[in-house]
Each structure stands twice: as structure tokens, then as C-alpha cells.
């Protein structure tokens, strides 16, 4: 691919994929690959999902793009669906194109309403690709929670904790990524997050749940923040909600929308509230509900976790972390990681290679048989290097 500028930092291993179906990709020789990353954690219902394809084709035949002065009824229908599953009754939503944008508009609205200047997140969060987020040299407070992982009081800590005492009072928004941690799948203690939320809220700040990766069933619940005792003001949704189509949503709770009626906010983008993206969002939610995929993902996640834990030997595989169908497998030796990764691809299995770990985010439709087949191949690949 001579004329494509690749700047993701990831090596292109299979350049000749020609078709896909469900968990599987096929190259021009007909070789199949089980995609255990769901693309870039996006195809939650599998590649080439027939029902989602039907919805896309139907909407394209009606209206796929809308201008500023006209719209389509699918917007309101889809907004009601996603606000319902979030429990944001009487809230509002903005349909956008990427998770980065859903985070960005949530930050902008927070600063607009609170008139505070500093955004806050945990030190290992990934929040998007915009420079306003990647450059955290000013107007950001990063809370380093490394010591909280091993703290004896991590499950019972209170507001007197020295780590919490460092939080400034001028926080406009605390953006919480409930588990992805830049792809390394780390779960901050519940008490820590609950205390941060209380401090920020007591000082007039907003809470943003970054559910771009962890949302839409990925963690065995609709949203990752539901594993914590918090209710956010904003929810940023992306990736899996489009099943591979670039659509995202910023959800806004009712109290915040009431504030916006008194203090209006302006934001305009070419593909904001497009009917095509909205129709896909509505279809993905409907498909998940009709096929009970949240519960199935939770159950299959427990099975996958059990099998992965059985591979931990402290020689090569040192730790497994996961929730629902989102896992990290820590490998002791990066050279061995690359060798196992290449062997898995050769055998027809795609996982995420993070150097010191593998990342698994299979589609929610993965079956127990497919899980057990992958585990057997991972066990075989690992044994080659012992």
C-alpha cells in the first residue's frame, strides 16, 4: 500500500483481506482469521452483520446526511433508545463521528457551564486523538493512582486520603475511563472513583464517563461505569455502537440539559446528527436486546476469564485482567510476546499486541466453542516457547 500513510504505530500484518463474516476475516487466498480485537474494538456484533447491513441499506435509500435546517425521525427514535439504556431519562444526545469528538464536546460543555478551566483524568487514561486531549501540559490535572493499586485501604479509603487531597478545586470535568487504561485493562478501585466524583461534584465540576471502549456490552453491562456507584453527567459512546461504522454519541443528563437551556452552547460539525449513523445506533441497540447479548457477553466473559487464568504460569503469562469480554494478558518477555503473536496470526487468530501484553476484545457474538478453540491454540502457541 504505497500511497497510504500509516501512522497508527501498529504494523500492518495482513494487507489483503477481501471479505468478512461474523468473527472471521478472509484474505485473497481464502485463509480465515478469527478477529479477537473486533477491528479496533468496534465490530461488537461481528463483521458484515446482515441485520445491520440491512438497516444501513434502507437508510441510505431514504436519507443518509442532513443539513442544519432539516432532519429525519430516526434521530429522535435513536436518541430515545440510547438515553433509555443509559438511564438518562429526559436527557439529550448529540450524534457525532468519533469517540474523540464525543469526549471533546463533553469537555467543552463542562467548561462552558462550570466556567472552570482544568480537566481531570487518571494518569493512564486514553481519551482521544485531539491535541486538546493528547497535550496535557496545561489545563489538565492527572491523578496518579499507581499507589492505590496496592494500598491496603483501597476498598475503604475516604476523603482524608493524601492522594485525594491533591485534587484542585477548579476542575471543570473529571473524565473517567472505567477499565481500558490506554488498552492495558486496569480497573481503578471503586472507593477511589466514588471519592473523586464526590470531590469534583462538591466543587461544581462535571463527571464524564468515557465509554468509547467500555460501553455497549463490552464489560458485561451496557456501560463500564455501571460497575461503580456513580452516575455521570455525560457519557461518551463510540466504537461498538456503530459496529464498524464511524458514529459516536455524547449523552447529556437531564440536570445538565436544564442548565444548557439557561446558558446556551454552540457546536456545529458537518456530520453532526446524521440519519445514517443514528439508524445504525438504533439497530445495534435493538440487535443486542433481541439477542440478549449483554447477559451472554457477561457469561462468556466468565468462561474466557477462567480459561485464561488457567494459562498463568509466571514463566511467560504473568497476569490476566478482564471484565466481560475485555481482557489483557500480561507476558513476561516482549520478544516472546511477538513470537506468540506471529504464531497466532499464522494459525488464523488476531489479538492485540501491546508489547508487554495481549489485548482481547472479541465480538459479543463469540460462542463458547470459539472461545475454547482459541484457548487451545493459545495454549499450543505458548508451549512452543517453553
What is the predicted role of each segment?
Residues 1-386:
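Conserved N-terminal phosphate-binding loop of PLP-dependent enzymes in the Aspartate aminotransferase
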Amino acid at each position: 500500500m504505497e500511497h497510504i500513510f500509516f501512522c497508527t504505530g501498529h504494523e500492518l500484518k495482513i494487507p489483503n483481506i477481501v471479505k468478512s463474516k461474523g468473527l472471521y476475516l478472509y484474505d485473497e487466498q481464502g485463509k480465515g482469521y478469527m478477529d479477537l480485537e473486533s477491528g479496533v474494538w468496534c465490530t461488537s456484533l461481528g463483521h458484515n452483520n446482515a441485520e445491520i447491513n440491512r438497516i444501513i441499506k434502507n437508510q441510505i435509500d431514504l436519507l443518509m446526511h442532513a443539513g442544519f435546517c432539516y432532519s429525519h425521525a430516526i434521530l429522535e427514535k435513536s436518541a430515545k433508545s440510547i438515553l433509555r439504556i443509559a438511564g438518562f431519562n429526559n436527557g439529550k444526545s448529540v450524534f457525532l463521528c468519533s469517540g474523540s469528538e464525543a469526549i471533546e464536546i463533553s469537555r467543552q460543555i463542562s467548561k462552558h457551564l462550570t466556567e472552570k478551566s482544568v480537566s481531570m483524568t487518571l494518569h493512564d487514561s486514553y481519551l482521544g486523538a485531539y491535541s486538546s486531549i493528547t497535550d496535557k501540559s496545561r489545563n489538565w490535572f492527572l491523578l496518579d493512582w499507581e499507589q492505590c493499586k496496592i494500598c491496603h485501604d483501597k476498598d475503604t479509603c475516604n476523603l482524608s486520603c493524601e492522594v485525594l487531597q491533591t485534587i484542585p478545586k477548579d476542575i471543570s470535568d473529571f473524565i473517567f475511563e472505567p477499565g481500558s487504561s490506554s488498552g492495558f485493562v486496569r480497573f481503578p478501585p471503586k472507593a477511589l472513583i466514588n471519592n473523586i466524583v464526590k470531590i469534583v461534584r462538591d466543587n461544581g465540576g462535571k463527571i464524564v464517563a468515557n465509554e468509547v471502549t467500555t460501553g455497549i456490552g463490552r464489560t458485561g453491562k451496557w456501560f463500564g461505569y455501571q460497575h461503580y456507584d456513580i452516575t455521570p453527567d455525560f457519557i461518551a459512546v463510540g466504537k461498538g455502537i456503530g459496529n464498524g461504522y464511524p458514529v459516536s454519541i455524547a449523552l447529556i443528563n437531564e440536570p445538565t440539559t436544564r442548565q444548557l437551556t439557561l446558558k446556551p452552547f454552540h457546536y456545529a460539525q458537518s456530520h453532526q446528527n446524521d440519519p445514517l449513523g443514528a439508524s445504525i445506533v438504533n439497530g445495534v441497540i435493538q440487535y443486542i436486546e433481541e439477542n440478549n447479548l449483554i447477559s451472554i457477553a457477561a457469561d462468556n466473559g466468565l468462561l474466557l476469564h477462567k480459561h485464561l487464568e488457567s494459562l498463568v504460569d509466571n514463566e511467560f503469562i504473568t497476569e490476566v485482567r478482564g471484565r466481560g469480554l475485555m481482557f489483557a494478558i500480561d507476558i513476561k518477555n516482549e520478544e516472546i510476546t511477538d513470537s506468540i503473536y506471529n504464531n497466532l496470526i499464522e494459525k488464523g487468530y488476531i489479538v492485540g499486541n501491546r508489547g508487554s501484553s495481549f489485548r482481547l476484545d472479541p465480538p459479543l457474538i463469540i460462542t463458547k466453542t470459539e472461545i475454547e478453540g482459541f484457548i487451545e491454540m493459545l495454549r499450543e502457541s505458548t508451549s512452543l516457547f517453553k
